[in-house]
């Protein structure tokens, strides 16, 4: 939610008049919200996430002259008036895995954890990148995995994380939406560490819940504000290939990891340099 609001402010600075509706996680609200926006006659409607795919496809068919951009979706064959921006989740999670493995090494451990929201392809893309990144710095590292079964169950997220922490590891990558807050809560309780997802979770928590921010080594982030500005700028220039999905990664600055004060505090400088070297290899196509 924080990154989306940042995106709105960034668009306003671009000189675009922006209105928005927060539909939350209740999928029944997506269709009426999209219809209402179509009826108001906006030049362009932005959405985010694959949770609203059914509603988006239906509304796009009902309003064929309305243009839509989804800033973060897995849909591969969108309607002719819909453009999908995808992100290379495996690239940002690759860096997260490297950071996690290096932190584990600092602690004398060769095992890290992963808590996913659900056992689905989009989340498993995070897992694959995480494992590959960890193995890039320690080929013998072990990765313990767990799925919450929900993106909104913080209690279950905490329960799963506690089981992993109690198995003898100290670092968990939480790709679990709101359930990930339960993982962070477990880290605080156990004196362990977390890698966040989607947005800079330490930055989002540092004022309201500093004890939680202090256990977030970094976050695998999607640069939604920047991606929104780039997409709208292209739309204004008539350069958007509607009816297609394009995927962007580290090279396009569409994804990355949070390099903030907590990252500098919780990961040694030599290890941060190693993560940066791996990042440059990804940018170079290695």
Predicted regions and their residues:
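A residue-level marker of the well-folded mature domains of exported/periplasmic proteins
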Residues: 1-286
